Curated annotation (Swiss-Prot):
<dbReference type="InterPro" id="IPR002501">
    <property type="entry name" value="PsdUridine_synth_N"/>
</dbReference>
<dbReference type="InterPro" id="IPR036974">
    <property type="entry name" value="PUA_sf"/>
</dbReference>
<dbReference type="Pfam" id="PF08068">
    <property type="entry name" value="DKCLD"/>
</dbReference>
<dbReference type="InterPro" id="IPR026326">
    <property type="entry name" value="TruB_arch"/>
</dbReference>
<dbReference type="InterPro" id="IPR020103">
    <property type="entry name" value="PsdUridine_synth_cat_dom_sf"/>
</dbReference>
<dbReference type="GO" id="GO:0160148">
    <property type="term" value="F:tRNA pseudouridine(55) synthase activity"/>
</dbReference>
<feature type="domain" description="PUA">
    <location>
        <begin position="245"/>
        <end position="320"/>
    </location>
</feature>
<dbReference type="Pfam" id="PF16198">
    <property type="entry name" value="TruB_C_2"/>
</dbReference>
<keyword id="KW-0819">tRNA processing</keyword>
<feature type="active site" description="Nucleophile">
    <location>
        <position position="78"/>
    </location>
</feature>
<dbReference type="GO" id="GO:0031119">
    <property type="term" value="P:tRNA pseudouridine synthesis"/>
</dbReference>
<dbReference type="Pfam" id="PF01472">
    <property type="entry name" value="PUA"/>
</dbReference>
<dbReference type="GO" id="GO:0031118">
    <property type="term" value="P:rRNA pseudouridine synthesis"/>
</dbReference>
<protein>
    <recommendedName>
        <fullName>Probable tRNA pseudouridine synthase B</fullName>
        <ecNumber>5.4.99.25</ecNumber>
    </recommendedName>
</protein>
<dbReference type="GO" id="GO:0000495">
    <property type="term" value="P:box H/ACA sno(s)RNA 3'-end processing"/>
</dbReference>
<dbReference type="InterPro" id="IPR004802">
    <property type="entry name" value="tRNA_PsdUridine_synth_B_fam"/>
</dbReference>
<comment type="function">
    <text>Could be responsible for synthesis of pseudouridine from uracil-55 in the psi GC loop of transfer RNAs.</text>
</comment>
Length: 338
């Protein structure tokens, strides 16, 4: 299937098997079955950010509601912007960089400074797909140098007078306000961003959005009634935040070494993404689906499948605690098919 027009997180991925594998049910557990305290500390909430507060304020409220020590959001939204604000909790905050680098999608209200022919508006908007040059706004927190950002798709949804509603999928770090300004310049009439809502952030969509009130209610139900079902619904395992990354599946015997910071050798791999590239950020997972670490691939899929030795990946951030799996465990208890 073609990946044209898709966000990176929407490109279909498949796993290929390198060798047979077994996992011991006595160690680790599927992410969705973690004890509730661990589930929270290794969770992510897809908050529907309201208009008004800053992204940091929303993340602080999430932290206060759940009583976690840390909470970090993946990609800031201006106070007036609404929509998806995935917020990672506790240990899961180590995965924030992986989510921040994923593609984003927005619905934007562009206000033209005078009415223009609809055919021309659509034509000009189409020309803004692909790589574009952007200079960060004057009020930006980053250095003002020209940068290249990719627009994966830009679809005009509605035009009424000087109002243009469009959907845009873009690379992280794209300034939609600047995009609106540049479209106005290209049309020769000028324009500015009137409103903006984020509808996708990496693997997260509006289907799993929750409000701060829903999060608070779910927490109260658990604390007062002992009912954790609603809390498990509104909080997702941290693995969902990196589901867009290529995967490498580890043997049980390789897990603890990775947790201690060791590089991943080829014999420790049982399966992997079919299109892994050297240097690519990848997720290292157990056979039960637990995220062990984020790593940088040192070999391609083809090289790993052919190799019997060598370093396949080097951990960048370790998210699983050492001792979760025994070192060098080899006893065959239960087979898991890829």
């Amino acid at each position: 299937m073609s990946s044209a027009g898709k966000l990176p997180s929407e490109v279909e991925r498949t796993l290929v098997r390198k060798s047979g594998a077994w996992t011991n049910p006595a160690y680790g557990c599927p992410p969705e079955k973690r004890p509730i305290h661990e589930y929270i500390e290794k969770g992510v909430v897809n908050i529907d950010k309201p208009r008004g507060p800053t992204s940091h304020e929303v993340a602080a409220w999430v932290k206060a509601i759940l009583g976690v020590h840390t909470a970090g959001h993946a990609g800031s939204l201006d106070p007036k912007v609404t929509g998806l604000l995935p917020t990672l909790l506790g240990k899961a905050t180590l995965a924030v960089p992986a989510l921040r680098l994923s593609g984003k999608e927005y619905i934007c209200h562009l206000k033209l400074h005078r009415a223009m022919p609809q055919k021309l508006v659509r034509q000009v908007c189409e020309e803004f797909t692909g790589p574009i040059y952007q200079m960060p706004p004057i009020k930006s927190a980053v250095k003002r140098v020209i940068r290249v950002r990719t627009i994966y798709h830009l679809e005009v949804l509605e035009i009424e007078g000087t109002s243009v509603l469009f959907r845009v999928g873009c690379e992280a770090g794209t300034y939609i306000r600047k995009l609106c300004h540049d479209i106005g310049l290209a049309l020769g009439c000028g324009g500015h961003m009137q409103g903006l809502r984020r509808t996708k952030a990496g693997p997260f969509t509006e289907k799993t959005l929750i409000t701060l009130h829903e999060l608070k209610d779910a927490y109260v139900f658990w604390k007062e009634d002992g009912d954790e079902s609603e809390l498990r619904r509104v909080i997702r395992p941290m693995e969902s935040a990196v589901s867009h990354l290529p995967k490498i599946i580890l043997r049980d015997s390789a897990v603890d070494a990775i947790c201690s910071g060791a590089s991943l050798a080829v014999p420790g791999i049982t399966g992997l993404d079919s299109n892994l590239a050297e240097g690519e950020l990848t997720g290292l997972f157990t056979l039960k689906g637990e995220l062990v670490a984020l790593a940088k691939a040192k070999m391609t899929t083809e090289e790993i499948l052919k190799a019997s030795a060598g370093i396949a990946a080097s951990p960048i951030r370790v998210l699983m605690e050492a001792g979760t799996y025994p070192r060098g465990w080899t006893k065959k208890e239960e087979k898991v098919q890829l």
